[in-house]
């Protein structure tokens, strides 16, 4: 039993803190389902604990991981113990209703099953963590730069200077996802997704390991506003984006990544024959006869180099396109050198 429980706790480990508020480290077991909610996201997974309780998940996982051998979890005198050999390890608990303000006990079913895991949704969530800004005012969310927007079969986000858009490989409704939820999703997204659905104001994502993950959908009751913001973003991208036609060789990408490592400067100058950052300079064979020159922040360039296959620059920015043509983006604020 202990190994089965430990396997489930390992799934939630990236979400759980060792210290902090009770909602950040405790979970509630009800009828064989473990529920966790920290005020930003919610998660639930079947677990082999045969009684209901509100339990310190970090403490439980730590004890089970360090006990050498098979153990059992018992409820004795309204306390929870991990019993091993002749030793009982007491695990801290709270009253069963202590987390009712941060947990909705949905145990919902996904309305749409995924024959294949939606990879582009995962990829773009990873990219969006560097684009989407934290919400400054909960009462007046700036959907333009404080959410990842999904609409019309695509996903788009911006940091006001750079824009990236992806064509989804799975049909999803109109949504706006905040940075806080994206960060937690990126911590646990390694497993394949097998189902999705909308549950009240949440996007439900079900993974192959049995985990159900709920991300707050800020588009709930805000659909028209989200669509207007989406159209504004995509319209801006259409206006500044130029069809890329220059392929940057892997060797050149490697040199740009290298010069960032040996330089303390955030900005990288880059053209078709060399790259420069601070006092460091690396030369490579010319890869195009077309004008190709710019300077920008490396953190923005890094995303383009990783996902982009084809590129085009002008006096204001750089457009890039993935090999599959499913992801495109634009880096603004390119500086002359």
Regions found by a protein language model. Give the residues of each.
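Structural preference for solvent-exposed beta-strand-turn elements
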Residues: 1-337
């Amino acid at each position: 039993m202990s190994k089965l429980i430990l396997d489930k706790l390992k799934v939630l480990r990236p979400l759980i803190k060792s210290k902090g508020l009770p909602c950040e480290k405790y979970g509630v077991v009800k009828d064989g389902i473990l529920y966790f909610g920290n005020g930003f996201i919610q998660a639930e997974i079947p677990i082999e604990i045969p009684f209901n309780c509100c339990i310190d998940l970090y403490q439980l996982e730590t004890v089970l991981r360090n006990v050498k051998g098979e153990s059992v979890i018992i409820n004795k005198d309204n306390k929870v113990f991990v019993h091993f050999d002749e030793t009982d390890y007491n695990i801290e608990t709270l009253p069963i209703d202590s987390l009712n303000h941060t947990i909705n006990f949905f145990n919902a079913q996904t309305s749409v099953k995924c024959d294949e895991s939606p990879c582009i949704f995962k990829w773009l969530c990873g990219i969006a963590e560097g684009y989407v800004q934290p919400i400054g005012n909960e009462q007046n969310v700036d959907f333009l730069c404080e959410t990842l927007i999904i609409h019309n079969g695509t996903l788009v986000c911006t940091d006001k200077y750079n824009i990236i858009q992806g064509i989804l490989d799975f049909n999803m409704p109109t949504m706006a996802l905040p940075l806080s939820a994206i960060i937690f999703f990126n911590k646990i997204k390694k497993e394949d997704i097998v189902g999705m659905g909308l549950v009240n104001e949440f996007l439900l994502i079900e993974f192959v390991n049995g985990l159900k993950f709920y991300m707050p959908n800020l588009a709930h009751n805000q659909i028209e506003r989200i669509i207007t913001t989406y159209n504004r973003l995509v319209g801006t991208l259409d206006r500044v984006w130029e069809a890329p036609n220059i392929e940057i060789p892997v060797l050149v990408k490697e040199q740009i990544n290298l010069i960032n490592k040996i330089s303390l400067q955030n900005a990288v100058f880059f053209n078709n024959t060399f790259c420069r950052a601070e006092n460091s300079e690396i030369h490579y064979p010319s890869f195009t006869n077309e004008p190709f020159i710019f300077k920008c922040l490396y953190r923005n360039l890094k995303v383009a180099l990783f996902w982009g296959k084809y590129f085009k620059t002008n006096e204001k920015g750089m457009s890039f396109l993935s090999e599959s043509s499913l992801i495109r983006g634009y880096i603004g604020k390119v500086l002359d050198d």
